[in-house]
Amino acid sequence: MTALLIDGNALSKTLRAQAAERAAALTARGHQPGLAVILVGANPASEVYVRNKIKACEDNGFFSLKDAYPATLSEADLLARIHELNRDPKIHGILVQLPLPAHIDSHKVIEAIAPEKDVDGFHVANAGALMTGKPLFRPCTPYGVMKMFEAHGIALQGANAVVIGRSNIVGKPMAMMLLDAGATVTICHSKTRDLAAHTREADIVVAAVGKRNILTADMVKPGATVIDVGMNRDDAGKLCGDVDFAGVKEVAGYITPVPGGVGPMTITMLLINTIESAERAAAAAA
């Protein structure tokens, strides 16, 4: 059996077209959705991510603002800029590209963003609200994964789901969203004693640790859905995920590729979160 591919590029295209329609409707009413992206330092990977986010905005009728600062920018100056953007009615989403230079406290920076403009969903107000199932914004990567399940009719209610990884950005919110959808969720991580014992029982596995081949074919239940959130490089320097794709695709029922799986969905959900913020702002102004 060869797994069916969950194509993140194709689903993204559909969702972005819907986002563009909503953006056009808002713009016609004088409320063009606006996203501000802040980059501090010259991390090459961060520069690529920021460029892709700005391009996605431009391609879909959003207003976008990119603030690029040297790595020497002080924490106080960064916080002052965030406070300015919090007050700017043209901006509906504020995103600070992580990681930040060591002298800047990323927790303090995220907490400075107004919760109603926290389109990454990282602010403690949104992270806490996710626990109750009522966040203003869901973190983009796990939100994108949930849209993939929805698009392919993958049943979550009663399913055994394993999330490998416990980060605040992917692992923890992914587990909460699966739990909210009725799955029985196990979170595994670097201290988990027997990872394979957990994954072999899982109907759904989400791998999100940033470690190549953490999930191999012998660890997967036949027919399971495997979502690969990892972004790594193989020995030849080629982009790969956390899953041994060649092996696992022969066992799984559904699988996401890397690249072209979860990655495009992350930026798409950033657009959706920004649209939702703009729609709330427009309704409040009406």
From Swiss-Prot:
Known catalytic reactions: (6R)-5,10-methylene-5,6,7,8-tetrahydrofolate + NADP(+) = (6R)-5,10-methenyltetrahydrofolate + NADPH; (6R)-5,10-methenyltetrahydrofolate + H2O = (6R)-10-formyltetrahydrofolate + H(+)
GO cellular component: cytosol
SUPFAM superfamilies in UniProt: Aminoacid dehydrogenase-like, N-terminal domain (SSF53223), NAD(P)-binding Rossmann-fold domains (SSF51735)
One Pfam family per UniProt: THF_DHG_CYH
Gene it is expressed from: folD
Known EC number: 1.5.1.5, 3.5.4.9
Keywords associated with the record: Amino-acid biosynthesis, Histidine biosynthesis, Hydrolase, Methionine biosynthesis, Multifunctional enzyme, NADP, One-carbon metabolism, Oxidoreductase, Purine biosynthesis
Molecular function (Gene Ontology), one example: methenyltetrahydrofolate cyclohydrolase activity
Domain of life of the source: Bacteria
Residues binding NADP(+), per UniProt: 165-167, 190
Organism: Burkholderia orbicola (strain MC0-3)
Functional description taken from the UniProt entry: Catalyzes the oxidation of 5,10-methylenetetrahydrofolate to 5,10-methenyltetrahydrofolate and then the hydrolysis of 5,10-methenyltetrahydrofolate to 10-formyltetrahydrofolate.
Entry similarity comment: Belongs to the tetrahydrofolate dehydrogenase/cyclohydrolase family.
InterPro entries found in the cross-reference section: Aminoacid_DH-like_N_sf, NAD(P)-bd_dom_sf, THF_DH/CycHdrlase, THF_DH/CycHdrlase_cat_dom, THF_DH/CycHdrlase_CS, THF_DH/CycHdrlase_NAD-bd_dom
Protein name: Bifunctional protein FolD
Record's keyword annotation contains NADP: yes
Subunit structure: Homodimer.
